[in-house]
Curated annotation (Swiss-Prot):
It is found in: Virion membrane. This is Envelope glycoprotein. Residues 1-15 form the signal peptide. The chain crosses the membrane at residues 479-502. It comes from the Viruses. InterPro entries: Baculovirus_Gp64. Keywords: Glycoprotein, Membrane, Signal, Transmembrane, Transmembrane helix, Virion.
Length: 512
């Protein structure tokens, strides 16, 4: 026994002839890598979801306006000469708008062009706005009077109607989910689902109808919550969630995103997010109280967003390069460990490459592989004449009996890793802006048409052409000249009297 121990110590001493065991430094321990703590967490949160079966409501928009110009031509000396011209708004009533929408036509009143004398009384009476029908009509502005010493009346109408689907949002209003109709100016109008909404604005009338109900269901919403979310130099708390193809940021336990509203159950982590975001009111938002659906991005905005994404991308590239470098270091360390252990466990390399081979090292880093018996049975330690005992394959014998495993082995997880989240592509619906919808673009174009009409006066206004001058009625020139001549005869008499008086004064003074 003593001889065996001496030989073992001698062999150990010979194995490391270049190591000085008489001097040492330390002690040391293997230090572990301490990554930056990750505060973001992913969790399923319970919520009550309110949704609708449709994504559009039906908008009917109609307008009606009358142009009334009551003029008198009494010449320059008559202070009553001039025109009283105005636009009168006659928005259709609710019943009228329903009829307009179903017939795709609008109604308007009588037209009066250059009505003079007793016919000019049409401008003084009550106008009947529903006597004629047309798919659409634009007025012509007239405010001239070519009849001296007479009144003249000009009445014309404009009207139009459209019916088209428009999108909407759902919104919490006093703990109740309402339908929020989005208007082109950025404001919203809330109403209950299934209840038509009617309102007027100057010469326009609007009717919004929907045929859906708000459905309620209990769901699980997947959210990433980060209590240490950095925005530049400012730290805040954020919660980003996904519900199917919808992605949104949650700022309160009652939250809405387009066609869905959520009432989240109480959660300590989410409550901290709500408290942090409570001070961010609508006045602090970039666009105030306006709906974000009316705001469009400029080229500069897109360039700024692209630059921010490029910066983040470069940061990711640098992080991946660092990870790749660390992985290479780990691979080198692991190769060294495997090489060292494989000199003791000759089957290690075979198990790693999934081949029935054993290794035999012939130098520090070079080895040979030997073919071995392939283990095909997984419920016994014996294969043919070989038995697996104490981590080694040996011959079956009295000292190495075969053992059969009857019970299914129980797995032991020594890592306790949680499952990774794998992102998946989702189709996001883009709605565009409110102004781009057919119904609201009709309203905008109609208002622009009225502005252009008011800039152009028939017979002598903006854009006058030879054809326009020839459109003057017969007698117009005579009326203008007559008004100029007869309406100013008093002026001419005064000038003649002053001239005669001046001559008499000169003669009496002996100057001529």
């Amino acid at each position: 026994m003593f001889l065996q121990t001496a030989l073992l110590l001698l062999s150990l001493g010979v194995a490391e002839p270049d190591c000085n065991t008489k001097t040492a430094t330390g002690p040391y321990i293997l230090d572990r890598y301490k990554p930056k703590p990750v505060t973001v967490s992913k969790k399923l949160y319970s919520a009550t979801r309110y949704t609708t079966s449709a994504q559009n409501e039906l908008l009917t928009a109609g307008y009606r306006t009358a142009w009334v110009a009551y003029c008198y031509n009494g010449g320059l000396v008559d202070s009553n000469t001039g025109c009283n011209a105005r636009l009168l708004h006659y928005p259709p009533s609710r019943d009228e708008l329903l009829l307009w929408g179903s017939s795709h036509q609008c109604s308007y009143g009588d037209i009066c062009h250059d009505c003079w004398g007793s016919d000019s009384y049409a401008c003084l009476g009550q106008l009947d706005p529903a006597k004629h029908w047309a798919p659409r009509k634009e007025l012509v502005r007239r405010d001239a009077n070519w009849k001296f010493a007479y009144h003249m009346c000009n009445i014309d109408w404009r009207c139009g109607v459209t019916t088209s689907p428009v999108f909407f949002n759902l919104q919490w209003v006093k703990n109740e989910v309402k339908v929020s109709t989005l208007l082109p100016n950025g404001s919203t109008v809330e109403h209950s689902a299934g209840e038509p909404l009617f309102w007027t604005e100057k010469d326009f009338s609007y009717l919004v109808k929907d045929n859906f109900e708000i459905q309620r269901e209990e769901v699980k919403i997947s959210c990433f919550v980060d209590p240490d979310y950095w925005v530049g130099e400012r730290k805040t708390k954020k919660a980003f969630c996904q519900d199917g193809t919808n992605f949104f940021e949650v700022t309160s336990h009652q939250f809405c995103h387009q066609y869905a509203c959520y009432n989240f159950s109480k959660d300590e982590l989410l409550e901290a997010v709500y408290k942090e975001r409570a001070h961010e009111k609508s006045k602090d938002l970039p666009f105030g109280n306006k709906s974000w659906t009316v705001v469009t991005a400029s080229i500069d905005d897109l360039h700024a967003l692209s630059a921010a994404q490029a910066f983040e991308l470069e940061g990711l590239r640098a992080s991946f390069a660092e990870l790749d470098s660390r992985f290479r270091q780990l691979s080198e360390i692991l190769d060294t460990v495997i090489s060292s252990i494989a000199k003791i466990d000759e089957r290690l390399i075979g198990r790693l490459i999934k081949a029935p081979v054993s290794s035999r090292f012939i130098s520090e880093d070079k080895f040979l592989l030997h073919q071995c018996v392939d283990s095909v049975a997984n419920n016994t330690n014996c294969v043919g004449d070989s038995a697996y005992v104490d981590g080694r394959w040996t011959h079956v014998g009295d000292n190495h009996p075969c053992t059969t495993v009857v019970d299914e082995p129980i797995g032991i997880d020594i890592y306790n890793f949680s499952a990774l989240w794998y992102p998946s592509a989702a189709e996001v619906d883009f709605r565009g802006t409110v102004q781009s919808e057919d119904g609201w673009s009709f309203v905008v174009k109609s208002k622009d048409a009225l502005i252009q009409t008011m800039m152009y006066t028939k017979n002598g206004g903006k854009g006058t052409s030879l054809t326009d001058l020839l459109d003057y009625p017969s007698g117009w020139l005579k009326g203008q000249l007559g008004g100029l001549l007869y309406g100013n005869i008093g002026v001419y008499l005064l000038i003649a009297f002053a001239f005669v008086l001046l001559i008499r004064l000169i003669k009496s003074a002996g100057l001529c």
